[in-house]
Amino acid sequence: MLRTHYSSEITEELNGKKVKVAGWVQEVKDLGGIKFIWIRDREGIVQVTAPKKKVPQEIFKLIPKLNSEDVIVVEGIVNFTPKAKLGFEIIPEKLEVISKAKTPLPLDPTGKVKAELDTRLDNRFMDLRNPRVMSIFKIRSSVFRATREFFYKEGFIEIHTPKIIATATEGGTELFPLKYFENDAFLAQSPQLYKQMMMSTGLDKVFEIGPIFRAEEHNTTRHLNEAWSIDAEMAFIESEEEVMDLLERLILYVINYVRENNEKELKILEFELNEPKKPFPRITYDEALEILSDLGKEIPWGEDIDTEGEKLLGKYMLENEGAELYFIYRYPSEAKPFYIMKYEDKPEVCKAFDLEYRGVEISSGGQREHRHDILVEQIREKGLNPESFEFYLRAFEYGMPPHGGFGLGAERLIMRMLDIGNIREVILFPRDRRRLVP
């Protein structure tokens, strides 16, 4: 390797010893008889100090020729001293320029000179050199790692379902069509039907982390056309509340994992991530509509709670319940997909829920209808043709246990967890209504 240590690995035990560091030139300072380089790597900053009388002359002459963002390797002796900004410095014995950076730069990776979001996204490779931006993606990595840890500890089996499909998952029109040889196909908007089919196999508890594609023309700060979904499904449940319990445990596990393992990144972001109030409050759809009515927002029964309503409800729950996260459940059947089970004694209401995070829906789930004949009827009620779902329905004809699950939007979880205003900030190369490159 060209480096022996990251910046964060240089400790007092290395004082007086030789190391090799590598990274990008963040700053060069020339004070005549002494020159400085600050090198940035993934873990932080290293100060290189070059006194004219202590370093080879070729190094001393090379330093002023360095540009910001040149990639260099420095080999030298570690010197811990209170005179150094970071508490230590490296006295160089060798300096190699690996790659020169063009000037001017498309944006300032230190963030001192602000850039518009579009400029940043057009130059994402350089945007991530900003420690704040990099911290977001280190935390994103932790979210996915913690998610997998949680599911394995809970006895779940990871699956991978097709992303090229022949049938709309929920019968909607928000699909990206594509040509699949001589057939018409679509990009998958959800693994819903496939994870339900897995409940007929005996795997019992499955999860998937993968991309979903939705051809929604929304151009908002919380919508993406390609996003990552965390999906789970489990068999032999008695009610949707067991699924809500599972989702609550997952969210708490992920947040606490980030709090424990990403202290440095949270500090860079200047953000204090608190453990949510638990248990998460649970309010029915009817109760949510009553609260909104008291706040002057009327929503006809049976309709989805719109963005304004979600925001009002989020503010109310925070101020009155101290809750950032809360469930809304027992939705009108007409507002939810065909595969959600209805209440026997009140079929106009179904066993569905949403999880809201400060006024933004981050997850939907519920108990599924596992009885074949009723499921077929519910497909018809939505104006869909059961023949289009034959591959899915077959799994319900040969022994299907009661089951339920959820889909959790990874980007929405991360943006709300870190209180980031635009969902495009938490995905590397966002795909939205207007952005297809890079």
Curated annotation (Swiss-Prot):
CDD domains: AsxRS_core, ND_PkAspRS_like_N. It is found in: Cytoplasm. L-aspartate binds at residues 170, 214, 364, 368. Its main location: cytoplasm. Mg(2+) 3 binds at residue 361. Residues 192-195 are annotated as: Aspartate. Mg(2+) 2 binds at residues 361, 364. Its cofactor is Mg(2+). It comes from the Archaea. GO terms for biological process: aspartyl-tRNA aminoacylation. Binds 3 Mg(2+) cations per subunit. The strongest magnesium site (Mg1) is bound to the beta- and gamma-phosphates of ATP and four water molecules complete its coordination sphere. One of its GO terms (cellular component) is cytosol. GO terms for molecular function: aspartate-tRNA ligase activity; ATP binding; magnesium ion binding; RNA binding. Its EC number is 6.1.1.12. Keywords: Aminoacyl-tRNA synthetase, ATP-binding, Cytoplasm, Ligase, Magnesium, Metal-binding, Nucleotide-binding, Protein biosynthesis. The keyword Magnesium applies. Catalyzes the attachment of L-aspartate to tRNA(Asp) in a two-step reaction: L-aspartate is first activated by ATP to form Asp-AMP and then transferred to the acceptor end of tRNA(Asp). This is Aspartate--tRNA(Asp) ligase. It comes from Pyrococcus abyssi (strain GE5 / Orsay).
